[in-house]
Amino acid sequence: MDDSLRVSVLSEALPYIQRFAGRRIVVKYGGAAMVHAELRDAVFRDIALLASVGVQPVVVHGGGPEINTWLKRLDIRSEFRDGLRVTDAETMDVVEMVLVGRVNKQIVNGLNRLGASAVGLSGSDGRLVEARPWGDGNHGLVGDVARVNPDVLEPLLARGYVPVISSVAANPEGESHNINADTVAGELAAALEAEKLILLTDTQGILRDRDNPNSLIRQLRLSEARQLIHDGVVAGGMTPKTECCIRALAQGVAAAHIVDGRVPHALLLEVFTDAGIGTMVLGCG
């Protein structure tokens, strides 16, 4: 990169750095960006940079591929119903071991290596997230968010720490549940009055035509996002992600972004450039 291009990049980023200093940005980390070493390192660098310029990032993660690997290694078969893993007690033990004890610490260590001050938590810690059964309760220990206690995170954020949160939480009886990480991220963003919710995915964002990669919708209003679901333009796996964004925006989050985590440094490109790279849904209209 020549000197003039470096200056151009920094000049474009500066207004956004100034705008978001001291603001909270909740990042749901998952998909290819969690699996491939180059992408993983780029995400860690992006989050560390956000923290270094005064933004307050909060990371929420799942860990589907790692869970699948360990279930196979332990010869535990998975049953899927309505697209969700039916989670019995044996499976839940593995989910909790992998998400809380392994994946969470890998993320924390990766961020700390780059100079961030990351702290690993699960939804159970300090009753940060209280779980309830998902849907009709026929999926075992698959959970939903009953309530969020953001007070757990406030002292950490005030002191410059980066909370890294696994999507495992307990119900009032102390029984652990596996909750969709998108859902946890959205509810935390609302409870923290975050400026942005960013979902790192394995798609470009919301497409006007699912068969046309050039039909990316770069910006939507809340009402338009709802209409796209109603019209079937948003369907399949994009539906729960869009609904997660809608719920967060309806509770006061300023903007939600669905971003292609397969692109190196997607996080910085979305936050600190004029064009961005994904779909931004605005909480107005």
UniProtKB/Swiss-Prot annotation:
It is an enzyme of class 2 (transferase). The record marks K28, K241 as: Transition state stabilizer. GO terms for biological process: arginine biosynthetic process via ornithine; L-arginine biosynthetic process. It is found in: Cytoplasm. Substrate binds at G63, G64, R85, N178. Its EC number is 2.7.2.8. CDD domains: AAK_NAGK-C. It catalyses: N-acetyl-L-glutamate + ATP = N-acetyl-L-glutamyl 5-phosphate + ADP. GO terms for cellular component: cytoplasm. Keywords: Amino-acid biosynthesis, Arginine biosynthesis, ATP-binding, Cytoplasm, Kinase, Nucleotide-binding, Transferase. HAMAP family: ArgB (MF_00082). Catalyzes the ATP-dependent phosphorylation of N-acetyl-L-glutamate. Belongs to the acetylglutamate kinase family. ArgB subfamily. This is Acetylglutamate kinase. It comes from Synechococcus sp. (strain CC9311).
